[in-house]
C-alpha cells in the first residue's frame, strides 16, 4: 500500500503540497484579538500604507466627522507623502487638509464635494492636480472600474465587536446608515475600523462584516452625531423655502405621478427636504401610500413611514438622529450601499425605481442645466452628491430653488458649472413661478389643467435679472482646479482657478 506522500508525489497537478503546521502556530495566526491595535499609529503601520497610496473615508457624520482629520494628522506626523485622498465627501471641518496639501502629504483628491476653507484654497489653485468631483453613484463606478483603487480605508463606526462586525445605528455616537462606507469595506485592499466601543461578538445587524475588516483601533470619539443634521441637511423654518416646498407639493399632486404606490427622494437643501411635510395631508385625504422613499432619510420621512404612509425607507445616509434611531427599530427602514443606491454600472440601482426626485440647485440655466458645486463667485462650495444620479433615473426630476438669493440670480443664461445636464431635469419650482422643460410635453399638459401658473424658463431668467441685474462674468485663469465627473465617469465640466 502506498503512503500519502507517495500518492501525492505521483500526482499533485503542479499544486503546492500540504506542509504540517503545529496547532499552536495555527491558533497564534488566528488569535481572536489579532485585529486589535493599541493605537492609531500601530493601525497605520500594520495597514501597510506607503507613499503614493490611496486612503479613503466616509462622510456619514457629515459636519460632525472626526475621523478624516484624526487619521490624516497622524499620517502626516508619521511622514507619509504623495497620497490620494478619496473621501465620499469633504466638508467645512476638514480644513486641516489645506496644510497637508501644502506639505505634500496629499497630492490628489477624489470627492463628491468640497466646502469651507479647503474648497476656497483649492478654487484658488492650492492643489497641483485637479480634484475629481464625482457623484455618489459615480464614486462606486470609479472604484469598481479600477480607476479609483483604494489601498487603505479608514472607516469610523460608533461600535463594533473585536472581529470587525459593525453598524452605524448602535452605540453612543449613532450616525445611521453606513451606505458609503460599505463600498470601501468591500473594495479596499485593507480596511481599518476606528470605533468608540466594543460590544459582544457577534455584533448584529451587520453593515460592515468581519470578513472585510483587517484592523480595529479604539478611539475616544469618531464623530458628533448632533452635527449630522446641519447645513445642507437642516430642516428649514425659512418662510420662502417653505413656500417653495408647498408649491412643489402642488406640482407633485398635479403631475400624474402622485398615485398609490409612488416612490420619491428628496435631496439636500431646506426646500427640497421640506416637501415631505406637505405631502402627508394629501396622502391621508386621498388614501395614497408611497411604496418607498430613497436616499438621505430624514425625520419627516420616518414620521410618514411610522404613520403607514411610506411603506419602506431605503437609506444610504441618515440625515438626522431620528433617522439613525429608526434604522435600528423599524424593520422596513433598510440600509442600502451606495452601489445599490445609485451606481450607473451596477446590476440594479434603486434610483432606477424612482418616480419623483426633488433636488436643490445653486444655479439652473435656460437649458435646465444645474450647478450644485460652485457659487456665483466661481468658488467651489457644494457637492455633486446624488444629484445627477437621481435626475437621470427618476421619472420626474424637480428642482426647487429661490429665483434669486439676495442680489444673486439662481436662474441664469448659463450655469458656471454643469453637474446635472438639462436633458435630465423636468421641472423648476421657484418662489416666482414654475417652468417645465419643453422636452416634457406630458408634464406641461398635466400642469396646464391646474391653476398653477406656468412660465418658460427664459421668462424666469428675465424676471431674475430684472431684480438683480445681469451678473458679471467671472474671470478665471487657465489652470483647472477640478474636473466634474458624470455618473458614468465621463467629464461633464471643468472648474478653473478663480482669478484674484
UniProtKB/Swiss-Prot annotation:
This protein's record includes keyword Lyase: yes
Catalytic activity: citrate = oxaloacetate + acetate; citrate + acetyl-CoA = (3S)-citryl-CoA + acetate
Protein location: Cytoplasm
SUPFAM superfamilies: NagB/RpiA/CoA transferase-like (SSF100950)
Cellular compartments per GO CC: ATP-independent citrate lyase complex; cytoplasm
Any GO BP: acetyl-CoA metabolic process
Single Gene Ontology MF annotation: citrate CoA-transferase activity
Entry EC number(s): 4.1.3.6, 2.8.3.10
Keyword terms of this UniProt record: Cytoplasm, Lyase, Transferase
One protein family per Pfam: CitF
Subunit structure: Oligomer with a subunit composition of (alpha,beta,gamma)6.
Protein task: Represents a citrate:acetyl-ACP transferase.
NCBIfam families associated with the record: citF
Annotated protein name in UniProt: Citrate lyase alpha chain
Gene name per UniProt: citF
Amino acid at each position: 500500500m502506498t503512503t500519502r506522500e507517495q500518492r501525492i508525489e505521483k500526482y499533485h497537478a503542479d499544486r503546492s503540497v500540504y506542509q504540517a503546521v503545529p496547532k499552536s502556530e495555527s491558533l497564534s495566526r488566528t488569535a481572536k484579538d489579532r485585529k486589535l491595535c493599541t493605537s492609531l499609529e500601530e493601525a497605520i503601520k500594520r495597514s501597510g500604507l506607503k507613499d503614493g497610496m490611496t486612503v479613503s473615508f466616509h462622510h456619514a457624520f457629515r459636519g460632525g466627522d472626526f475621523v478624516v482629520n484624526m487619521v490624516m494628522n497622524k499620517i502626516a506626523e508619521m511622514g507619509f507623502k504623495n497620497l490620494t485622498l478619496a473621501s465620499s465627501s469633504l466638508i467645512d471641518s476638514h480644513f486641516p487638509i489645506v496644510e497637508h496639501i501644502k506639505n505634500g502629504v496629499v497630492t490628489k483628491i477624489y470627492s463628491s464635494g468640497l466646502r469651507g476653507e479647503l474648497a476656497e484654497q483649492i478654487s484658488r489653485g492650492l492643489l497641483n492636480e485637479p480634484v475629481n468631483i464625482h457623484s455618489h453613484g459615480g464614486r462606486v463606478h470609479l472604484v469598481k472600474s479600477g480607476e479609483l483603487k483604494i489601498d487603505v480605508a479608514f472607516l469610523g463606526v460608533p461600535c463594533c465587536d473585536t472581529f470587525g462586525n459593525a453598524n452605524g445605528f448602535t452605540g453612543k455616537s449613532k450616525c445611521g446608515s453606513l451606505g458609503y462606507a460599505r463600498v470601501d469595506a468591500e473594495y479596499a485592499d485593507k480596511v481599518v475600523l476606528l470605533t468608540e466601543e466594543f460590544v459582544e461578538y457577534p455584533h448584529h445587524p451587520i453593515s460592515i462584516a468581519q470578513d472585510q475588516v483587517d484592523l480595529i483601533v479604539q478611539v475616544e470619539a469618531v464623530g458628533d452625531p448632533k452635527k449630522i443634521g446641519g447645513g445642507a441637511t437642516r430642516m428649514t423654518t425659512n418662510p420662502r423655502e417653505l413656500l417653495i416646498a408647498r408649491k412643489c407639493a402642488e406640482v407633485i399632486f398635479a403631475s400624474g405621478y402622485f398615485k398609490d404606490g409612488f416612490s420619491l427622494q428628496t435631496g439636500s437643501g431646506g426646500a427640497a427636504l421640506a416637501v415631505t411635510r406637505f405631502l402627508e395631508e394629501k396622502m391621508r385625504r386621498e388614501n395614497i401610500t408611497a411604496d418607498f422613499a430613497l436616499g438621505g432619510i430624514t425625520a419627516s420621512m420616518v414620521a410618514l413611514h411610522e404613520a403607514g404612509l411610506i411603506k419602506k425607507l431605503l437609506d444610504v445616509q441618515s440625515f438626522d438622529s431620528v433617522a439613525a434611531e429608526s434604522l435600528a427599530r423599524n424593520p422596513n427602514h433598510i440600509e442600502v450601499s451606495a452601489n445599490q443606491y445609485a451606481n450607473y454600472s451596477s446590476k440594479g440601482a434603486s434610483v432606477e425605481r424612482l418616480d419623483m426626485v426633488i433636488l436643490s440647485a445653486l444655479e439652473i440655466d435656460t437649458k435646465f442645466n444645474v450647478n450644485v458645486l460652485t457659487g456665483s463667485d466661481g468658488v467651489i462650495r457644494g457637492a455633486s452628491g446624488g444629484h445627477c444620479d437621481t435626475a437621470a433615473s427618476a421619472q420626474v426630476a424637480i428642482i426647487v430653488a429661490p429665483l434669486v438669493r439676495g442680489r444673486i440670480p439662481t436662474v441664469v443664461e448659463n450655469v458656471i458649472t454643469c453637474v446635472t445636464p438639462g436633458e435630465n431635469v423636468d421641472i423648476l419650482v421657484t418662489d416666482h413661478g414654475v417652468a417645465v422643460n419643453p422636452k416634457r410635453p406630458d408634464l406641461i399638459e398635466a400642469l396646464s389643467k391646474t391653476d398653477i401658473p406656468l412660465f418658460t424658463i427664459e421668462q424666469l431668467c428675465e424676471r431674475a435679472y430684472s431684480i438683480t441685474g445681469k451678473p458679471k462674468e467671472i474671470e478665471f485663469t487657465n489652470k483647472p482646479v477640478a474636473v466634474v465627473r458624470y455618473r458614468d465617469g465621463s467629464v461633464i465640466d471643468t472648474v478653473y482657478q478663480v482669478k484674484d
